[in-house]
């Protein structure tokens, strides 16, 4: 990781999470790449005011992106997620938009919907609806959104601990007590959260 200033995000991050096989599911490896490519300065010539690289050539992209673009003959863009499977790939944009399939015929028919969605309903409104009618959970249900949020937050804490393997038990890092300091914010006097 390359750092900006204390308390800031990293200039560039590469993180890998490994999830073991469980309850009828295969093991999964998740790799996260962001920020500027190693060696590219983090300055106004290379990065805009909200931290987005001005050119794709400056981005810290996974090495496999160019290989997949050549294989499937289409651009995968520079922001979003790529799911690599045995039959091909699916790429989604940073907001769940811009689906790209490789090979293109991978997308033959729409899969069944697994989670109910309210058209035109934003997250806070959907959350309030679920409070009023608990028989139908939120579209962004805590059953999967809480583990997802934990994964992302661990991705923020891990680079601060340095380049190493960290083991997580659901509450703390079990193999590095020093890394646990990054799991909670230290507030200035008068700004503490109560309770």
Segments predicted by a language model, with ranges:
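Glycine-rich, aromatic-lined ligand/substrate-binding cores of catalytic
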Residues: 1-138, 149-170, 175-182, 186-195
């Amino acid at each position: 990781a390359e750092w900006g200033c204390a308390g800031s995000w990293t200039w560039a991050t590469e993180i890998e999470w490994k999830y073991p096989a469980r309850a009828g599911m295969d093991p999964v490896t998740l790799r996260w790449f962001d920020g500027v490519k190693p060696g590219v300065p983090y300055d106004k010539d290379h990065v805009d005011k909200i931290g987005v690289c001005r050119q794709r050539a400056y981005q810290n992209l996974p090495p496999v992106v160019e290989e997949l673009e050549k294989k499937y003959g289409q651009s995968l863009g520079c922001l979003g997620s790529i799911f690599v499977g045995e039959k091909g790939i699916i790429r989604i944009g940073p907001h769940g938009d811009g689906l790209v399939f490789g090979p293109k015929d991978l997308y033959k028919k729409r899969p069944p919907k697994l989670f109910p969605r309210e058209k035109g309903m934003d997250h806070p409104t959907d959350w309030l609806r679920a409070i009023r009618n608990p028989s139908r959970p939120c579209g962004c249900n805590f059953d999967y959104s809480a583990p997802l949020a934990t994964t992302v937050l661990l991705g923020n804490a891990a680079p601060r601990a340095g380049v190493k393997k960290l083991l997580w038990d659901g509450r703390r890092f079990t193999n590095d007590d020093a890394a646990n300091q990054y799991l909670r914010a230290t507030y200035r006097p008068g700004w503490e959260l109560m309770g």
